[in-house]
Regions:
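Histidine-centered, metal-coordinating catalytic motifs and their short helical/loop contexts
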Residues: 75-120
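Amphipathic alpha-helical segments of tetratricopeptide repeats
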Residues: 30-31
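Extreme N-terminal leader/anchor segments
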Residues: 179-197
Length: 197
């Protein structure tokens, strides 16, 4: 399936409040984008390429995700027992690890321990991960603007009866155009995985 079809489905799911489906489609789009960008082999440390794409571009994701803190090596409380072995001594996990875990769970159609908010939220409390829906937009923009996806094309996409097809189609593989739209965003990939202690 084309990356553009996953983006269309993610967009529609997000509009209907089906966040697990939106994350599942975004994970599949990220997988294909990472395969196109890095090839089929993982990186030197054995990290899969989808994880690599998220890790290297986490600061871009955060800066496109409305009102989120932009920090290298951002950690949040570990939201699930299966992530505890990747947590530090204080029980905190790197955000990119949590996002990848969440998206994989969505793709596997597993329950997501998430409370979604329309206002800017990022944290773990009352046994749930709290996130704002702006995450899906940030991921969509990252995927669409990757050079590896420059040959993608959407047929039709509407928001509240208004076509956004032309705008999205202008962004495929065009990070430069998005940089003009969001000049305050962080655009340089971070080799975060190689700098962690």
């Amino acid at each position: 399936m084309q990356v553009s079809e996953h983006i269309r489905r993610a967009f529609q799911a997000e509009r209907c409040g089906q966040m697990r489906r939106a994350l599942s489609e975004l994970y599949l789009a990220l997988e294909e984008t990472a395969r196109r960008e890095y090839g089929d082999a993982g990186d030197q440390k054995g990290q899969d390429n989808t994880a690599r794409l998220i890790t290297e571009h986490l600061q871009t994701i955060l800066s496109l995700w409305p009102n989120m803190p932009i920090a290298k090596n951002l950690k949040i409380p570990c939201p699930a027992p299966e992530l505890e072995e990747q947590a530090d001594a204080d029980g905190y996990c790197f955000l990119d690890i949590v996002l990848l875990w969440l998206m994989k769970r969505a793709a596997e159609e597993k329950e997501l321990p998430v409370q979604w908010h329309t206002e800017p939220v990022l944290g773990v409390w009352d046994g749930a991960l709290h996130l704002s829906t702006g995450l899906t937009w940030a991921l969509m923009l990252l995927i669409v603007t990757r050079k590896a996806n420059r040959n993608e094309h959407l047929e039709e996409l509407e928001v509240a009866g208004i076509s956004v097809t032309a705008m999205i189609n202008e962004l495929w593989g065009n990070e430069r155009k998005l940089k003009k739209m969001f000049p305050e965003a962080v655009w340089e990939p971070e080799l975060t995985a190689n700098t962690r202690q």
